[in-house]
Amino acid sequence: METKKNNSEYIPEFDKSFRHPRYWGAWLGVAAMAGIALTPPKFRDPILARLGRFAGRLGKSSRRRALINLSLCFPERSEAEREAIVDEMFATAPQAMAMMAELAIRGPEKIQPRVGWQGLEIIEEMRRNNEKVIFLVPHGWAVDIPAMLMASQGQKMAAMFHNQGNPVFDYVWNTVRRRFGGRLHARNDGIKPFIQSVRQGYWGYYLPDQDHGPEHSEFVDFFATYKATLPAIGRLMKVCRARVVPLFPIYDGKTHRLTIQVRPPMDDLLEADDHTIERRMNEEVEIFVGPRPEQYTWILKLLKTRKPGEIQPYKRKDLYPIK
């Protein structure tokens, strides 16, 4: 359930129906994650890695999507290398989620010693100059943690999101996201509420990975293939009068540390045409994800929209048929 203000801010609210027995399994899962989050990371991370890899073998559809994406983006890598990336991706996912839960339950002071920022001076300069900012954030598994940390330090944050299929998970997940303040805007409400928040001084959090279809997108190079890409970030920076700053979080399950990489503002986009903007967006994703592909959510249908006459890769029966 949700309550909406006049700025279309999404505020998750507990609904009485969440007590129904059909949701007990979801609540058990939430309780389990909370318990895991309170376990020291040196104990939980190896266990979560094994569980994640096991789940990745069972989740055949998700695994297939990831392998298809990797085969198109990294054709130069061997099949064994791509399988290893997928295994590490499934290992990283629960580890990053556990850190997010730990942050929400125990507070930022407990995880700060395990967080390192590369390029923090860029953010500090923006704050000193009171500049409007939109972070360009590839969809990694630890994607929510940097925004939560900045919100915990008093920085007003605004982000757009998709609702989860399970209403209990949706309620809990978005409550955790708002743990330290900030605004959430449902994508179903359109882009205007997000723009309004950035204009009001909230730092925006924008994920560029979604496939919006062929109507408003262009086909632009993405790793070794191409992707339907929307030049939205260029328009947003002009409409919001904001600077665009690429950011990407990397969780290392061996050191139990999160590294948040921040790159210089994309000021070159101000006078760029749509094609250049789209390519620069994808280029930033490549710079972040290329060295650490296991951090990225390859299970998404990133390459769904194809050029006329080309079959959607996820519908091709010759690509990684499920046995």
UniProtKB/Swiss-Prot annotation:
List the CDD domains hit by this protein, alphabetically: LPLAT_LABLAT-like
* Cellular localization per UniProt: Cell inner membrane
* Stimuli inducing this protein: Active under both limited and replete magnesium growth conditions and is independent of the PhoP/PhoQ two-component system.
- The regions listed as transmembrane in this protein's record are 23-43
Query: Which Pfam families does the annotation name?
Result: Lip_A_acyltrans
Q: What sort of enzyme, by top EC class, is this? A: transferase
Pathway annotation: Glycolipid biosynthesis; KDO(2)-lipid A biosynthesis; KDO(2)-lipid A from CMP-3-deoxy-D-manno-octulosonate and lipid IV(A): step 4/4; Bacterial outer membrane biogenesis; lipopolysaccharide biosynthesis
Coiled-coil-forming residues are: none
User: Do the record's keywords include Transferase?
Assistant: yes
Output one GO MF annotation.
acyltransferase activity, transferring groups other than amino-acyl groups
InterPro entries in alphabetical order: LipA_acyltrans (IPR004960), Lipid_A_MsbB (IPR011921)
Q: Give the membrane topology.
A: Single-pass membrane protein
GO (cellular component) term, any one: plasma membrane
- Where on this chain is HXXXXD motif (motif)? 139-144
Q: Which UniProt keywords apply?
A: Acyltransferase, Cell inner membrane, Cell membrane, Lipopolysaccharide biosynthesis, Membrane, Transferase, Transmembrane, Transmembrane helix
**Which reaction does this enzyme catalyse, per its entry?**
an alpha-Kdo-(2->4)-alpha-Kdo-(2->6)-(acyl)-lipid IVA + a fatty acyl-[ACP] = an alpha-Kdo-(2->4)-alpha-Kdo-(2->6)-lipid A + holo-[ACP]
Q: Offer one example of a GO biological process linked to this entry.
A: Kdo2-lipid A biosynthetic process
According to its UniProt record, the EC number is 2.3.1.243
Null mutant phenotype reads: A msbB1/msbB2 double mutant is impaired in its capacity to cause TNF-alpha production by human monocytes and to cause rupture and inflammatory destruction of the epithelial barrier in the rabbit ligated intestinal loop model of shigellosis. Mutants have no defect in their ability to enter into host epithelial cells.
**Main function:** Catalyzes the transfer of an acyl chain from an acyl-[acyl-carrier-protein] (ACP) to a Kdo(2)-(acyl)-lipid IV(A) to form a Kdo(2)-lipid A.
Could you say which protein family the record assigns here? Belongs to the LpxL/LpxM/LpxP family. LpxM subfamily.
Q: Which NCBIfam families match?
A: lipid_A_msbB, PRK08943.1
Mind telling me what this protein is named? Lipid A biosynthesis acyltransferase 1
